[in-house]
């Protein structure tokens, strides 16, 4: 029933334009992220970036985005994809809708569609570390360790002091060296 209400709400309004990745706060937040050394402070900055990415003025798309966690909890991935597809039709320049849909495709094992949405996300927001991480995970599943390593090295430029990125790079370096 909830999905029907969300889909109905999407058809009520069609012309809004503010998109997440255009937030004037993001440049400053990414600057802070590139310099932060404290992990708690880093987590706070990352949370603020996600908050900016999630913002959308279109109330119909906002309904979808506000209900993403419900789709995850219920494992209703196909309904999530349908709702996000409608959101993307309403706001085709909203990077986070593509990113969330890519995540649901990934969880369903549909890496091809996930990759398409990751590409759209990164086209709209090249600094989207969530999409970069998703891309790396897909490359790893295809055993393209060198490609995944390159993606994490790009993430490292955005998050130079992130220990989890360091660990992923270290693990991938080992996997790449085993292949040669």
Predicted regions mapped to residue ranges:
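N-terminal leader/linker segments that initiate helical-solenoid repeat arrays
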Residues: 17-66
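A conserved position within tetratricopeptide repeats
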Residues: 33-37, 50, 88, 122, ...
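Alpha-helical linker/edge segments of TPR/alpha-solenoid repeat scaffolds
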Residues: 38, 42, 54-61, 144-150, ...
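Boundary/linker segments of alpha-helical solenoid repeat arrays
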Residues: 40-43, 57, 129-130, 158-170
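Alpha-helical adaptor scaffolds
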Residues: 58-125, 130
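Register position in tetratricopeptide repeats
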Residues: 73, 107-108, 141-142, 158, ...
């Amino acid at each position: 029933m909830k999905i029907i209400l969300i889909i109905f709400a999407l058809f009520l309004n069609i012309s809004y334009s503010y998109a997440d990745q255009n937030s004037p706060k993001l440049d400053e937040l990414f600057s802070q992220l590139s310099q932060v050394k404290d992990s708690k402070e880093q987590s706070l900055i990352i949370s603020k970036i996600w908050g900016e990415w999630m913002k959308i003025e279109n109330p119909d798309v906002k309904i979808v985005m506000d209900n993403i966690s419900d789709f995850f909890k219920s494992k209703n991935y196909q309904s999530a994809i349908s709702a996000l597809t409608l959101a993307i039709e309403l706001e085709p320049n909203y990077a986070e809708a593509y990113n969330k849909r890519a995540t649901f495709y990934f969880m369903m094992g549909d890496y091809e569609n996930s990759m398409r949405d990751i590409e759209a996300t990164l086209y709209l927001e090249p600094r989207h570390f969530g999409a970069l991480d998703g891309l790396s995970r897909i490359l790893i599943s295809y055993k393209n360790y060198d490609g995944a390593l390159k993606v994490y090295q790009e993430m490292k430029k955005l998050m130079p002091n992130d220990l989890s990125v360091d660990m992923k790079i270290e693990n991938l370096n080992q996997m790449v060296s085993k292949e040669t």
